[in-house]
């Protein structure tokens, strides 16, 4: 069982889209998946067909403020093998509310570890959708994760932002989670008609080498439409270019297991 945070400090890079479609792809391969929506915007929540207007106690906020345990807030989605812990805007207040707790960075790890130890075999993967900033919530996710998946938009300044993110990850490894690894970098919003996309791809592959997945996710209007219908694009339109790319990426992600094993 692996806990993987999907992270980028920049918004609008396809982070949540990657979470919900990787989760859907893995679930269709009979993998049991738990998505944790750790973004106060709640986009992973609505993108999987649930409401981000639920009572705050019944969301990840309830777990992190101590009013609920993990097992009490897990919700079934409409998709087989795919569960979620939802989020809503109240989560944005957690950093202020826990200001006096010196161990607050470890709250999620403590709660999640306790649950998974009691229910071994419940899930093959836990995927955490991080907020697009280096906030307390992001630190919580990094502390409890085995590895990180980084969506990288193939646009100007993308690599500069990625370099900053890598520095942040190194600081977390030194102080809070020495076993944290980069599982891979996924190129998103790729436009083959645009020279900039191919340039960013080349620079990313030259610098990060095997960490960059072979699969690239194209710009595709269906990827933008699907969340408004409360479903992953893999289900909303299986034949569109975005779906085909995420199916391919899911296969590549699974095939990593033979090379990285449980240490990922």
Predicted segments, located by residue:
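P-loop NTP-binding core
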Residues: 1-264
């Amino acid at each position: 069982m692996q806990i993987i945070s999907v992270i980028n400090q920049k918004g609008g890079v396809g982070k949540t889209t990657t979470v919900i479609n990787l989760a859907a792809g893995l679930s269709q391969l009979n993998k049991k998946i738990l998505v944790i929506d750790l973004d106060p915007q709640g986009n992973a929540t609505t993108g999987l067909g649930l409401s981000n207007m639920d009572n705050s106690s019944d969301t990840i906020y309830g777990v992190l403020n101590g009013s609920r345990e993990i097992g009490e807030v897990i919700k079934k989605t409409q998709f087989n093998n795919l569960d979620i812990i939802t989020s809503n805007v109240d989560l944005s207040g957690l950093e202020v509310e826990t200001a006096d707790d010196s161990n607050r960075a470890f709250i999620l790890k403590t709660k999640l570890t306790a649950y998974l130890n009691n229910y071994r075999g419940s899930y093959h993967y836990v995927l955490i959708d991080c907020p697009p900033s280096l906030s307390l919530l992001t630190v919580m996710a990094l502390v409890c994760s085995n590895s990180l998946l980084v969506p990288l938009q193939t646009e100007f300044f993308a690599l500069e932002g990625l370099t900053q993110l890598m520095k942040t990850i190194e600081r977390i490894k030194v102080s809070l989670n020495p076993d944290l690894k980069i599982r891979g970098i996924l190129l998103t919003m790729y436009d083959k008609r645009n020279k900039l996309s191919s340039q960013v791809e080349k620079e990313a592959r030259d610098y990060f080498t095997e960490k960059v997945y072979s699969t690239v996710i194209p710009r595709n209007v269906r990827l933008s439409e699907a969340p408004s219908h409360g479903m992953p694009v893999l289900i909303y339109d299986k034949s569109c270019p975005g779906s085909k790319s995420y199916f391919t990426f899911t296969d590549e992600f699974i095939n990593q297991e033979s090379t990285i094993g449980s240490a990922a």
